[in-house]
């Protein structure tokens, strides 16, 4: 993306050693098996929520995927609850409103889901997409963009997921199978790649633009 990136896993750390916030051009919070509010077991989640609030308050670009989407939403006041049923595998979402990152999207699109919890829409948030089980599949609020679904998954990452016993257990509990999920991935991946590129390159461009303000 033209910027130096730092990847950190801080969920187990009560006081994580984070980079200087003022020097960050953007923040991305990814997924994980824990709940967004499991602060007692994963104290670093509180630091991530604080980071999300600070990013939005300062206009710094921040992107959340799955758990990251839930962390940003709850940090901004949304309610978290268990979904009526796990949403795992490929299933459709409906675009409610157009974000510039989503300008290529059809009204309905089939994407990869892997979550148990759902969040509401933060006050003043703009709903971008929804599905029948999950009322907030994507939203934006100021500099924040949250996506409950997984556009980041490539073939090698899917293989890693399907080598993880706990994820395979969740998949089977939701009525899926490894073979069927791989078939679905082969069916939809080529359709999703340009949309994924649009979202992530668009976010990277915003980070690059924000970086210019740090150098002034």
Q: Would you name each region that the model predicts?
A:
Residues 3-63:
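Flexible gly/pro-rich beta->alpha loop and the following alpha-helix that scaffold active-site loops
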Residues 34-35, 69, 118:
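Glycine-rich nucleotide phosphate-binding loop and flanking beta-alpha elements
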